């Protein structure tokens, strides 16, 4: 029963994240000479939006999610391995870094850089020729975007280590055996003013983080993410999933995320108070009414998100109860 449950959950995970199976292994081939020619041409220096797409292997995705979840409320950090094909960045693998994280930031010390250099040297000895292509870190409970510190880190790396990608994962908002909350970003060159773009997809950001988000949101852009796997990945993916599945079954988002849930409700309360204050002081013009509707719409979306997350947490508990407790009752 547990094997069937794990297999079904893995299929659900692949469907929710739209992981595509590739029929050939061309994507895994690496041509060092061609890559060096690409680096020398530096097409990204002529177009700040040159890189538009990211392809992430299912193994790299699952390793990042497992690492992010292991950090709990603390931020974690790791590296991305891969290559570039035209305007697409392909992430083949990822590995964790030994860093000191807090609830709001993650700092890489000398030991982490030494570990990274040694890891990259050893992995090339095994025949893996992919290069470091970026970094990832977690934002537990407050969404996928770049803070001021993140923008600074990404900008420095793009200046000296191009091509370079930044990925953010929110393990708290990632639904067990469901869609991964993830974002891939690149910063603009200093002094560059991006064109006015249409409204991006709304995401809930805590009131305490909105200022940091708003100040820096025009300094970077997001890339479209897709996922892939090959037939060669399946065995390793199954083993990784079994470990992830055990952790999922042995934990409950309702209990493990109690502080996050409380924070969400408090944040929603503060946003409602803020909306009420602004509504009471606003004039009855058409422009003010549009602002009021936008503000109330965002609060409504945040409220719906909190409700959906709680329902999903309850459903996961019901699912676990039907697997274990009812099976034991039937046997007795």
Swiss-Prot record:
| GO BP of this protein | asexual reproduction; proteolysis; regulation of cell cycle
User: Listed GO cellular component terms?
Assistant: COP9 signalosome; cytoplasm
Binding locations of Zn(2+): 137, 139, 150
Q: Which Pfam families match?
A: CSN5_C, JAB
- The SS bond pairs are none
The record ties this protein, via SUPFAM superfamilies, to:
JAB1/MPN domain
| Domain comment quoted from the record | The JAMM motif is essential for the protease activity of the CSN complex resulting in deneddylation of cullins. It constitutes the catalytic center of the complex.
Functionally, this protein is described as follows:
Probable protease subunit of the COP9 signalosome complex (CSN), a complex involved in various cellular and developmental processes. The CSN complex is an essential regulator of the ubiquitin (Ubl) conjugation pathway by mediating the deneddylation of the cullin subunits of E3 ligasew complexes, leading to modify the Ubl ligase activity. In the complex, it probably acts as the catalytic center that mediates the cleavage of Nedd8 from cullins. Csn5 is essential for growth or survival.
Protein name in the entry: COP9 signalosome complex subunit 5
